[in-house]
Curated annotation (Swiss-Prot):
Keywords: Antibiotic, Antimicrobial, Cytolysis, Hemolysis, Secreted, Toxin
Predominant localisation class: secreted
Family membership: Belongs to the cationic peptide 02 (oxyopinin-2) family.
InterPro entries hit by this protein: Antimicrobial_3
Pfam families: Antimicrobial_3 (PF08025)
GO molecular function: toxin activity
Domain of life: Eukaryota
A GO BP annotation: symbiont-mediated hemolysis of host erythrocyte
Protein name (Swiss-Prot/TrEMBL): M-oxotoxin-Ot2a
Amino acid sequence: GKFSVFGKILRSIAKVFKGVGKVRKQFKTASDLDKNQ
């Protein structure tokens, strides 16, 4: 029981980190494009 809850928490944290990574990548690309213009 406890372990499945822990797994769920870890999975949701991993999801958040993935989402943040994606957003940061897009943001960096956008700022790079901004510099080039």
